[in-house]
Every structure is written in C-alpha cells, then in structure tokens.
UniProtKB/Swiss-Prot annotation:
Keywords: ATP-binding, Chaperone, Cytoplasm, Hydrolase, Nucleotide-binding. It is an enzyme of class 3 (hydrolase). GO terms for cellular component: cytoplasm. It comes from Pectobacterium carotovorum subsp. carotovorum (strain PC1). HAMAP family: ATPase_RavA. It is found in: Cytoplasm. ADP binds at residues 23, 49-54, 196. Its main location: cytoplasm. This is Regulatory ATPase RavA. GO terms for molecular function: ATP binding; ATP hydrolysis activity. Pfam families: AAA_lid_8, ATPase_RavA_C, bpMoxR, LARA_dom.
Length: 499
C-alpha cells in the first residue's frame, strides 16, 4: 500500500511539473501523461495556435530516455519524411529496400503528427500498423518500434467517407481544446518568457525504461470489480438505446478498459472505481454532438448509479410509502368522527357533533393539504353551530381557510366510516382531525428503515472519499457526484423531519 501511495504521489508531482507554464491545459496534460504511461494514442481537436504541439513536446520530459518526433502533414507529405529516407547504399550494393529510421517515427518514443488527416494513404496505412502492432516493416525485417505515445492533432474531424475511420478508431483519447479563456491565465500566457526547450521535470520524477516496462505488466493486474462492470454495461445499454449515439467498437471498449486500469494503478489503487469510469467521456465520443451526448449519459450514470444514489432514493420512496400508509391508518383512527342519528326531514340519516365538543369554533386539520380557492390549505376554522346545522340539515357550510380572511364555501362530506372530510374542486378528499390529534409517532420499524438508509449513504460516501484523489478526472466531475450524494442526504433528512 505504501508503494502504491508513493507512486500516486510521484505521478501527481510529475504531472504538475509538466503542466508548468501551460495555461488551461491541465486536463490535456494529465490525460496525455496517462496515455504515455499506458502506451495509448491521443487525438487533439482544436484551432491552430493553442499549444497542441507544446503538449506533445512536454511529454518527452516525462521519460528519462525518450526520443521525440514531430511532423506537420500536408497533402504532399511522403513516407520518407515520416518513416525515414531509403538507404541508397543498401539499395545499390545489396538490392535491399531499407529505410534509415534514425531520427524518424520508427525510433521515437513520443510522436506528434499535426494535421493528421491531410496525410496520404501510404503514410496512414503504415501508421495504422505501427499503432496496432507497435511494429514497422523495414525491407526484409520487421522491427519493434518504441512508441509510447502518439499525439495526433487537427482542427477538423476526419471526413466520414475518407477512409480514415480505422485510424481514428485507434486514437483512444479524444480531447477538444480551445483558446485560453480566463483573464489571468491569458495575461500569464502573454508575459511568460520560458523556453519550450526547458525541462520542467526534476530527474527524480522522470520515468526510466525499466519502470515503464514493469508498469505495463502491473497495469494488467488491476481488477474490474462486478460493480464496475455493471456501471460500464449500463452505460453501453444507455447508449445503445439512443439513435444518435456514436458507434463504439468492441475494440474501443476493450482499450478503454485498460486506460481505466492505468488510471487506477497510477492513483494508487488495485481496482477500477466509479471515479475512473468518468474517463470514458474522453474515449467514446466521435464528433461535437456525440461529445455532448456522451457527457450527459455519463453524468446520469455517475449521479444515479455510481454510488447507489438512485437505489437509495427508490428505497427511500418505499419507506415513505410505508410511512404514509401507516399515517393514513392512524389518521383514520384519530379522525374527527360524527355520530350517526336517525331519519330527519326526508334524509336517510343525519349526524351530530360529539358531546365532547364544548368550544364555539372548531379548528380542524387536514390529513393532507388541498388546494381550495387557489390556496394551499392545511387547516380550517368552522363555527360550531354552523357545522351542527350542516350535519342536521345539509346545505351550505362555510369556514376560514388556514384560519384567516373571510369565510369561504366548503365542500364537506361524511364518509362511510363517519369521518368528517373535505374535498377540493377535483373531488380529492382529505380527512379532518382535531389539532391535538395531529402528531403521530412512527413505529420503530419505520425509523429503523430511515437509519439503515443513513448508514448505507454514509458507506457510499466513505467509498467515494476512499476513491479519491484521482489525478486524471476533473474536479467538477467529482463535484457532480458529491452534489448527488448530498441531494440523497437532504431527501432522507426531509423525509425524517416531515410531519
């Protein structure tokens, strides 16, 4: 545990060093670092002049011994400019078709290719093999290439019918970048005189070749718990149900899982957590519209299912239903009842007030509020004699709504259990009771259910706290989870405190 915590601290410090002097690029640097540490590819989408190339150059400094290669593609770019020129001597003396790869992509650990979609088929096909297999065919031999990170950039997406989908699908992380927005960051950008060639990473933080190779093996041992799989599968089902959702290949899901494993590993954990799954927002989108869609679906996932928020609210609803049923039963026992008497002037029955009523006016409380005469009413004030007359003879009965203002016409009735009730304009009724009978103590069975919900919520909050910090997930996404858990807590508290 101490080793994993130390690694997480080291990677955090390494990331902060790489971020120095780059403004509003924290998330991009961190995800590019994660991609480099796990051997993945990144696509940066955005207008020219927003530090896309500088991000790639910075990542070279994350490694103790790393060569970098960068190239700006045009329609006229040739394979020789990317993969190295042909050896004239080998061709002349031995008849071998061999490239001189020193200083070119086949011998670079960090690769940056700008305006990637302008490259021709010869370059793109060779590049596809390099990404897939990390191998480069050079004449009669096939060599392993050391590429740890490919950063491809463009200010546009690949054309739908341009034959570029296979390469685009290999770029696991996709990031949209824009110009610096905040005033202070823009000022700092203008006055910053540091050189792009300066290495901001202390030697003790940079990654050795041996460490990198060992970490690739360690990442494979990070477990996907059943709960984590269920979250990923739920997201997949959510997306499959949407017509406008992008096509996501099984290969992309598989590669995305390894990225989640790497996130957990470099944050000092041995299993994938719901926090790591947030990274899927940068792996599954295809264009601007699906970026918004993926983020929305992922937000629903983490705020409803990641820490059992929806399940807790559903169970709270069940407890509240049970509580309401109990309160209805108790209210009926405590309802204001009248006494049935015989026939009177052609009416089948008439009623009388109980002899225990000795006040001139009655305050009667509604079992549940109703909208009467456009206001929400919780209780009534009715003249005793007027009520007695209505019980005897029927007709109109009036009372003060909530005990204030002029008297208003009331639609009272006596139900078949001889309880006095009131109806609204839609004929929804509420039983009336005397105020001293209003409070109904809840049985232990129901209060225990509320306590269980509180305990389960505390456990989910403990897990959420345990799953942090996560270097590669923006704080605003963690805040969404915290807000959803707080909402659950507030709803439980409101339910416990309601009358």
């Amino acid at each position: 545990m101490r080793q994993t915590a130390a690694l997480a601290e080291r990677i955090s410090r390494l990331s902060h060093a790489l971020e120095h002097g780059l403004y509003e690029r924290q998330h991009a640097i961190r995800l590019c670092l994660l991609a480099a540490l796990s051997g993945e590819s990144v696509f940066l989408l955005g207008p020219p002049g927003i530090a896309k190339s500088m991000i790639a150059r910075r990542l070279k400094f994350a490694f103790r011994h790393a060569n970098a290669f960068e190239y700006l593609m045009t329609r006229f770019s040739t394979p020789e400019e990317v993969f190295g020129p042909l050896s004239i001597q080998a061709l002349k003396d031995e008849g071998r078709y061999q490239r001189l790869t020193a200083g070119y992509l086949p011998e670079a650990e960090i690769v940056f290719l700008d305006e990637i979609w302008k490259a021709g088929p010869a370059i793109l096909n060779t590049l596809l093999t390099a990404i897939n297999e990390r191998r480069f065919r050079n004449g009669n031999s096939e060599d392993t290439i050391p590429m740890r990170l490919l950063v491809a950039a463009s200010n546009e997406l690949p054309e739908a019918d341009g034959g570029l989908e296979a390469l685009y699908d290999r770029m696991l992380i996709r990031l949209w970048l824009d110009r610096v927005q905040e005033k202070q960051n823009f000022r700092a950008l203008l006055v910053n005189n540091s050189s792009e060639r300066d290495n901001p990473v202390p030697p003790a933080l940079s990654v050795s070749d041996e460490e990198y190779q060992q970490w690739q093996k360690d990442i494979e041992h990070i477990a996907l718990p059943e709960a984590g799989f269920e979250l990923i599968y739920t997201l997949r089902q959510q997306l499959d149900a949407l017509e406008q959702a992008p096509y996501i290949s099984d290969r992309r899901w598989k590669k995305a899982l390894r990225l989640l494993q790497a996130s957990a590993f470099f944050c000092g954990r041995d299993t994938i957590t719901p926090v790591d799954i947030i990274l899927l927002k940068d792996c599954l989108w295809h264009d601007q519209s699906t970026l918004t869609l993926i983020e929305h679906q992922l937000e629903l996932l983490i705020t409803e299912h990641a820490y059992q928020q929806k399940s807790l609210l559903f169970r709270l609803q069940q407890v509240n239903t049970k509580r309401q049923q109990y309160q209805r039963e108790q209210s009926e026992l405590q309802a204001f009842s009248v006494e049935k008497q015989g026939h009177f002037l052609g009416r089948k029955f008439h009623y009388a007030l109980p002899d225990t009523i000795d006040t001139e006016t009655l305050e009667l409380v509604l079992q549940r509020p109703l909208i009467l005469h456009d206001i929400e009413v919780n209780h009534l004030i009715i003249d005793k004699n007027a009520l007695q007359g209505w019980l005897q003879k029927g007709g109109e009965i009036r009372g003060k709504l909530n005990g204030i203002g002029f008297t208003q016409r009331l639609d009272l009735l006596v139900d078949d259990r001889q309880h006095l009730a009131i109806r609204d304009i839609s004929l929804q009724s509420s039983i009336l009771s005397l105020p001293e009978k209003r409070d109904i103590a809840l049985p232990a069975e129901i209060t225990d259910e509320y306590e269980k919900l509180n305990m389960q919520l505390r456990e989910q909050r403990r897990l959420f706290s345990q799953h942090q910090p996560c270097l590669f997930v923006p704080s605003e996404w963690l805040a969404k989870i915290e807000a959803s858990l707080q909402q659950v807590a507030e709803q439980i508290q409101q339910s416990e405190q309601q009358d």
